[in-house]
Every structure is written in C-alpha cells, then in structure tokens.
Amino acid sequence: MSNSVVAKRYADALFQLGREKNSLDQLVADFLEVRQIFTNDQKLNVFLKHPKIDNEKKKQFLADVFKGADPVVINTLKLLVDRHRTSTIPSIVDHLVALVNDTKGIADATVYSIRELNTDEKEQLQTSFAKRLGKRSVQITNVVDPKILGGMKIRVGNTIYDGTVSNKLNRISRSIVSANK
C-alpha cells in the first residue's frame, strides 16, 4: 500500500477520534509540532529507523519527548513505530490539517510572487479567493519566486491560477504561432 493511502487512512482515523473527543484543534496543534520536529531533526529519523534499536526504546523516547502532547498523539506515534511507518508522519499531518480546514471552510493557498506580498495584498487575495472557492476564509502562504517576471501564480489544492507575465507571454506566443500556420 502506498504511503499516501496509508497517511490518508491514519489522518481519517485521527480526524474522527478528534471529533468524538472535541479536541481537533489541540490534536492538530500537537501534530503540527510533531511534524516540525520530524522534518527538522534528521537524527531523530535515523534513530527511529535504526534496526538495532529496540522498538520499546524508540516508543519510550517518543513518549518522553512529546510528554506534554495529547495521549492520542503519543499513542499514534507508538503505533507508527511498531508498524515501521514513522516516515509517513508529515503526510499524515498534512492530510489531517486538510480535513480539519475543509470542515471549518478554510482553504490553503500558496501564492508565488516576485516579492513578498504586503498585508493589504494578502487580504485582497483572501477575500476574492474565499468568494471564488466558496470558503469562509483562505490561508495564504507566500513563496517568493525570482523566476516570475511579474504577476503571481496561486495554487489551491490541485488547481493553479497562473497570472504571471511569463505565462501571458507564452499564451501570446502560442497564439501567434498558431495564427501563422
């Protein structure tokens, strides 16, 4: 089974458990912290994948590191150690956050631009895309991309809205070439 399918199943189960316990926000906050640690600390990943280290030691280590977290988080981490699936943690968290945001009517958007957007520009994008997507709000992550000549490219899920100058130039070029045939 692919890691993506596995991650979605774990995220679905965690989402349902969080809803039952009315602790979705706390669960997401704890898992975001876990993801950050797993993403930034390569030594932790090496430790957890080391075949000569007993799983009980790995689970105790994780319980000590994340002792302030929700018990569901700690138990999930222990389960992932037992099943040798710790590499799926970032994907599980991403899927869980997407499920929670979808339930709350929040869309995640990545905006690629030549420069950092100011607060007013972000607010305008949030307002216009919230209406367009039928969501209550849009969380924007701004990525500065020096390859963009001007304008911006916005990615929401699998949909890309490309308003860059280079894309417009490519469209003009294609229309000129097709007109000359």
UniProtKB/Swiss-Prot annotation:
Protein name: ATP synthase subunit delta
First-listed, main subcellular location of the protein, grouped into a coarse class: membrane
Family stated for the protein in its record: Belongs to the ATPase delta chain family.
Gene3D superfamilies: N-terminal domain of the delta subunit of the F1F0-ATP synthase
Keywords: ATP synthesis, Cell membrane, CF(1), Hydrogen ion transport, Ion transport, Membrane, Transport
Keyword Transport: yes
GO molecular function, one term: proton-transporting ATP synthase activity, rotational mechanism
An example Gene Ontology CC term for this record: proton-transporting ATP synthase complex
Subcellular location: Cell membrane
Topology term for the membrane: Peripheral membrane protein
Subunit and interaction comment: F-type ATPases have 2 components, F(1) - the catalytic core - and F(0) - the membrane proton channel. F(1) has five subunits: alpha(3), beta(3), gamma(1), delta(1), epsilon(1). F(0) has three main subunits: a(1), b(2) and c(10-14). The alpha and beta chains form an alternating ring which encloses part of the gamma chain. F(1) is attached to F(0) by a central stalk formed by the gamma and epsilon chains, while a peripheral stalk is formed by the delta and b chains.
Function, in words: F(1)F(0) ATP synthase produces ATP from ADP in the presence of a proton or sodium gradient. F-type ATPases consist of two structural domains, F(1) containing the extramembraneous catalytic core and F(0) containing the membrane proton channel, linked together by a central stalk and a peripheral stalk. During catalysis, ATP synthesis in the catalytic domain of F(1) is coupled via a rotary mechanism of the central stalk subunits to proton translocation.
Superkingdom: Bacteria
Statement: the UniProt record of this protein carries the keyword Coiled coil: no
InterPro entries per record: ATP_synth_OSCP/delta_N_sf, ATPase_OSCP/d_CS, ATPase_OSCP/dsu
